[in-house]
Amino acid sequence: MDKSEKLALNVSGLLLVVFLVAIVYASVAKEVDVPTCITDMEPFATDTLFQTGPDSYELQMVARMWAFQPGNITLPAGSTVDLYLTSQDIIHGFKITGKNLNLMAVPGAINYMSVTFEEPGVYDFACHEFCGAAHHTMAGKFTIVEEEAFEGETFGEGSL
Amino acid sequence: MSTLDFRFTKSEKNLNSTLIIIPMVLLFIGIYGGFMQTLFRAGIVQSDPFMGGEYYKGLTIHGVLNAIVFTTFFAVALGNAVIPWSLKMNLNSKVAWLSGILMLVGSVITALVMVAGEATVLYTFYPPLKAHPLFYIGLVLVVVGSWVAFFNWIPMYLRWRKENAGEKTPIAVVGMFTTFIVWFIATLSVAVEILVFLLPWSLGLVDEVNVMLARTLFWFFGHPLVYFWLLPAYVMYYAFLPKIAGGRLYSDMAARLVFMLFIVFSVPVGTHHQYMDPAIGSQWKFLHGVFTFAVAFPSLITAFTIAASLEYAGRKRGGTGLFGWIKKLPFFEKDSWFFSYLIAGLVIFIFGGISGIVNASYQMNTVVHNTAWIPGHFHLTVAGPVLLAFLGGSMYLIHQFMGKPVKMKGWTLSVPYIYTIGVFIFSWGMMRGGLIGMPRRTNTGASYANPESMLYQPDWMPFIDISVIGGSIMFLAIVIYIVAFFATVSARSEATLEAVTFPVTAPLHDEPANWLRNFKPYIYIAIVLIVLSYTPVILDVLESTTGGSLPYSPNSPVPLR
Amino acid sequence: MEKEDKDLEGFSPKGAVAFFLIMITVYVVMWFSLYFELIGRG
């Protein structure tokens, strides 16, 4: 190994270490993390949404061929949602556009991630794992309204 | 290095030609499917004359034929070529043909089942979507065939080591063995997935399958698979490119180190495809992320070593200044047409590399997972450097083994450059679309890209259209290649048939590197890392999943039994 | 093209080092642009 090779080796190692440090920082300081193993939750087959605190909700969502239940959720701005996701048939994928929430829905397992909606607006989600013939129609949305205009959380069927 | 005393037998030549030509036909079917998918996604077509209106059937064919069938055949053919040539030993012809026939039969079965619409499960075949049992059997035959090829080389290598004690194993042989050591370890997992779980379940012998477990076994195989694609390209970069460019490999030791690191770190990384999965602890996902960074390291070293080797070649050709040597490289020399396939792939891989590091970066995967970014990324890797190196390699092997002159040299030489323009446009569209939420594996033309649909997403349209432009250019390049390839295959044999040869030259810096001369310690380290990284993952999956899944068809939300 | 067996005297890959450092810089810029996208999404 000559000098230039050693330089390339060191720079490569340094690059990867810098990336790793940034990842750990985002995880620890910014609390942006990946889903982990959930063992303290009973399996569920129906969807529910209920308030757990002044600005917090728990949503149990079921993915199936070819709809999310619920597919249409209305909440006030500033809400934090503890989202539990499972599938009742095959594998589906769930990602909220513009948010750090991206989950696989796998039958026999429960996935979990928390998300906070600060800004009012419409947040779409679309199934992103191939789930059969009508996969491309499996979608839904969160509608986040101003706190003053909010008339109680709603959730329902349908993608729109 | 004299090779005059070694000749391939007629049987070896015929076998290797077959292993190149038949998969080339399958590759083209798959690539046609890929081109149609860009049109489907944009809503330009709803049906095509050959494959019909089933987008996901076409996508399955595209993935399986291009990423699994074509790549495996080429890797075996390259091994069948460079290992005997480098060791100056003929193959056991019977075993080699057995391997080839197993792979051919398996590929044809798999292809027919897919075309019949009995296996629309994509190339990842995640349960509980169920394919026809013959789909799994066909894949098993392809894999077993590739193992037989590998087992055929092992005694040759051991004999050579005995007869040439103290000599360094030729780098091409090291590279091919690395490829197949990684492949063998990885395919053990998918063999368990198929033979223990999916096949009995598909046949109806058992009712249910644990989906998370099958998925985890798949990705144990699925990520090392990408190194199985990449490593034969690395063999050509390290062993052939320096000579083709007119120089020497800068450092022999760096090449050997790179291959050994691939053996160590290729496998304990699969969970980075499952960052967004349930039932796996995030600490284990992080561990797999760290190992993935470790396996990025040999590729970074490769970037430097190859650049240094090319600089040496460029300076020998009279290049001066910091970057003047680049201009002297044989980009457009017809007799060095192979150069364009390797250099264009390397340029593409600069961007394939960083987008891959992004994917592997733990929670950053949230932004890109299962979005169109992912196919954008892997068309810069497997459909970039890997495809181009394999196409160039296929042309070279045919030229050598059939003794045919390369036809349409100007066009042949241009293919990689046209393709590079296309793939950059395509991937840019896909990746940008992915960042604003466009999903992968989705027939957007029927919903999100259809102005009449309630789901219409106008923001995605520019990026979908860009991917059509890029995809069309890529397809054009491949059509040119296929014409040139078959023109070469059907050309008249060269008058003076010379012995098969490969562009290999001695390295510039040839250090002893005694610690890099034996695979064994690296295989042992790899096994330890695999056990450490996968035991907790499998335990998590088993402990936190409930029940199994009945099989489903893609066409109905009601289970098949 | 010169004869193959004649090696260059005192070759040092300055251009390759420069290329490599540029590539790493590009990598840092691309990676962190995605990283800040992630942090910004919340």
Q: Which residues are covered by each model-predicted region?
A:
Chain A
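Extracytoplasmic beta-sandwich strand-turn segments characteristic of Greek-key/jelly-roll folds
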Residues: 95-120, 149-160
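Short, exposed beta-strand-loop hairpins at the edges of beta-sheets
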Residues: 128-136
